[in-house]
Amino acid sequence: MSQDRLLRNVISVMIMAGYEVSEVFAMRPKSFDIIAGNGERIVVLKVISHIDSISEENARDLDRIARNLDGTPLIVGERARDAELERGAVYVRYGIFAINYPTLHDYFVEDSPPLIYASPGGLYVNISGERLRELRETRSLSLGDLGQILGVSRRTVAKYEAGMGTTIEIALRIEETFDSGVIEPIDLIQSKSQFTKPEMPEVPEEIPIQAAIEEMGMHVQPMYHAPFQALVRYDSHTILTGYGSAQKVARRAGIIGNISQVTRTHAMCVMTDDQRQRRIGRTLMIGEDSLLSLDEPDDLINLILN
């Protein structure tokens, strides 16, 4: 399947699932392809045929944007190494879940979460350790007794009860033994970031007014490989912010406004060479001098809202 077709299929799935989907934008390199939101959830998606093409830098950028939008990063692809991604299986690239298109459909449209995750050595499942312990104790089985039934050591059974995953074969053997389910589904929305440092070491040159904005009482989070150069936060407001010449930001104003609509945020472009205040769609176009002349963050919010 071509990259474009895969992206179109992903967009169709998210629309079928009731999500509003951002426009596709032409920009290289880019940390994400589309953002989907339904008023409650935001999913930032990177669509790429071979998931091994994702670098740590790509993953960090994707994770940073998703977390700062209170959303979830997700990779959708077709292959890993020399094999196709399995339907119903979750792969992980730098802490970010990666799945194929059918798994995306199952989760978001059919409300059927994946059960399997890929790890070095094969495919595995998570089991409920607490449920396993209850079943074992109800049958008055010791750790060793259950280990003999399953063909594993008592120490391994103890690890299962402590939350360690297991092979599909062992999990099915457990369920057959107790005639009860112990396999836990994987919630794609509940992934946790492995990147403990939210910012790159350097501050991008594109945001030279960062210090001035922060002196006004707002927080600025630089963004990389995105249509907007920063997220500006104040109180409950998030502003997707572009910065540069009027010609440069005018080309991005439309997609920034579109993403702000999907994510229920605001949009602003700060122009370095034009002080004429105006709007392009949802995006406030404001001159750099005009922005820095504002006294309070509320003054900016009022300009954006009015």
From Swiss-Prot:
Keywords: DNA-binding, Transcription, Transcription regulation. Residues 143-162 bind DNA. Pfam families: HTH_3. Residues 132-189 form the HTH cro/C1-type domain. GO terms for molecular function: DNA binding; DNA-binding transcription factor activity. PROSITE patterns: HTH_CROC1 (PS50943). InterPro entries: Arc_TR_HTH, Cro/C1-type_HTH, Lambda_DNA-bd_dom_sf. SMART domains: HTH_XRE (SM00530). This is Putative HTH-type transcriptional regulatory protein Mhun_2548.
